[in-house]
């Protein structure tokens, strides 16, 4: 049997082909699996479960069908969709997991994260993350009219794009450092949890890394994004493999 992991789909009405690829994946590749884990950024943006979206409705129906077939579906919030709540979770039939989460994966204890917590060199983002993950901030934000939430999300996205563009125009090595995980934080995370395998997304740099942490050989598996193709990690009792899904 196999457990599937995906992240960083960034589903958006502006990219319907990716949504269709995901729906096809749910119909044809997920049935019969042991579980499906979505480790954040399922959606490009999420400003509340009350936001009208035909695409999100279709995704909810498809995910619920997977769950109804006997394949449990788990969702961990990313930096784009951290406001996904229990209302949508019930519609989609998935269980929301905290970040980080430890699971038993065929006898191998494994740490799951979205991955943004590992990017500690990006201090500006970490400050923004701390603010927006605060329950008081979220309650106040969700209480605002939909139009105000849309405006805030657009402003935040524009600011993020401008910052990334500025970084790209500067020192390329600095851009790569800021947008990737901190090696020191990765090592500290392995030591903190006392585990030797970590699965995460966020950086859009799919790979399977082997490293030393706390005197142990550890494995860090990075999930791929769904911008120009699909990406899935398949894990079974014999190992793990990253695969691309063609449009």
Swiss-Prot record:
Its predominant location is: membrane
A Gene Ontology cellular component where this protein is annotated is: cytoplasm
Single GO MF annotation:
UDP-2,3-diacylglucosamine hydrolase activity
Membrane topology (UniProt): Peripheral membrane protein
Cofactor-binding details, from the entry: Binds 2 Mn(2+) ions per subunit in a binuclear metal center.
Query: Which keywords does UniProt give here?
Result: Cell inner membrane, Cell membrane, Hydrolase, Lipid A biosynthesis, Lipid biosynthesis, Lipid metabolism, Manganese, Membrane, Metal-binding
Question: Matching Pfam families, A to Z?
Answer: Metallophos
The record's catalysed reaction(s) read:
UDP-2-N,3-O-bis[(3R)-3-hydroxytetradecanoyl]-alpha-D-glucosamine + H2O = 2-N,3-O-bis[(3R)-3-hydroxytetradecanoyl]-alpha-D-glucosaminyl 1-phosphate + UMP + 2 H(+)
Q: In which pathway does it act?
A: Glycolipid biosynthesis; lipid IV(A) biosynthesis; lipid IV(A) from (3R)-3-hydroxytetradecanoyl-[acyl-carrier-protein] and UDP-N-acetyl-alpha-D-glucosamine: step 4/6
Which family does the record claim for this protein?
A: Belongs to the LpxH family.
| NCBIfam families found in the cross-reference section | lipid_A_lpxH (TIGR01854), PRK05340.1 (NF003743)
Q: What is this protein called?
A: UDP-2,3-diacylglucosamine hydrolase
- From which source organism is this entry? Xanthomonas axonopodis pv. citri (strain 306)
